[in-house]
């Protein structure tokens, strides 16, 4: 979920959502009868599973915070939950205020590591997959970031902003981004509801670029994990293959400190 800024709530969106135009919309809406993590997680997973007729796996997605482990612990006892997706502090979205995007959340690496080690203690590391997101590949090193997170315990990664930049031509960057995706004026038409803007986006070309990007990413990832003897399976939790030259980070993530 997030916040659909009032700039984007035009007549069409307002009609679909049944609200006045020009009003910011929290998404999803709050459940006033749920006052604990346990109740919220149970409601979320059960409702989604019921909506899909119990045929599609459901992966709740949460922000990387101090409560992420509490959510994960509840998922280990929830028969409806198939896994957990965690979005770190570097994640970018067009559905939030800048203060939310730039100054909230925990680093994804520490949350993923804590979650995996917690699952190991419970003997459930192969039963409840964790997916990492948030700024992965933001410096053009998607495969390397992915490999590191997998070795820390992630079962996979989710990528959004990097795909928009590499495949859809997003003009934003970490150092000089345009900062207007959240107000509906994206010059590439990616995050705009204005027909004069979104018609600039060639969806077919972007779709092909996405395919090409993931095929290239798959090749690069195999180049990294193959020397570890994992050419056909992911080295989930193989932290002995990781090292870092910062003793504090090494201690926090429980990986090797190398000079």
What annotation goes with each model-predicted range?
Residues 13-17, 25-31, 258:
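Glycine-rich phosphate/pyrophosphate-binding loop
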Residues 26-201, 205:
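Glycine-rich phosphate/ribose-binding loops and adjacent secondary-structure elements
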């Amino acid at each position: 979920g997030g916040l659909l800024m009032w700039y984007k709530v035009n007549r069409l969106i307002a009609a679909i959502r049944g609200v006045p135009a020009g009003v910011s919309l929290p998404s999803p809406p709050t459940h006033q009868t749920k006052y604990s993590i346990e109740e919220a997680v149970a409601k979320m997973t059960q409702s989604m599973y019921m909506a899909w007729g119990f045929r599609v796996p459901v992966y709740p997605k949460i922000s990387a915070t101090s409560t992420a482990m509490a959510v994960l612990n509840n998922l280990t006892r929830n028969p409806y939950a198939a896994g957990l997706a965690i979005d770190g502090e570097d994640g970018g979205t067009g559905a939030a205020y800048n203060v939310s995007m730039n100054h909230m959340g925990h680093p994804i690496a520490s949350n993923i590591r804590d979650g995996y080690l917690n699952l190991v203690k419970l003997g459930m590391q192969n039963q409840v997959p964790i997916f990492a997101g948030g700024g992965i590949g933001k410096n053009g090193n998607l495969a390397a970031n992915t490999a590191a997170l997998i070795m820390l315990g992630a079962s996979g990664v989710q990528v959004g902003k990097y795909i928009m930049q590499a495949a859809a031509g997003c003009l934003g960057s970490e150092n000089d981004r345009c900062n207007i995706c959240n107000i509906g004026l994206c010059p590439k038409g990616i995050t705009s509801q204005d027909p004069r803007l979104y018609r600039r986006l060639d969806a077919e070309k972007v779709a092909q670029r996405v395919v090409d990007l993931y095929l290239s990413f798959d090749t690069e990832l195999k180049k990294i994990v193959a020397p570890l003897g994992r050419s056909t399976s992911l080295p989930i939790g193989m932290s002995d293959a990781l090292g870092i030259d910062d003793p504090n980070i090494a201690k926090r993530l429980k990986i090797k400190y190398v000079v």
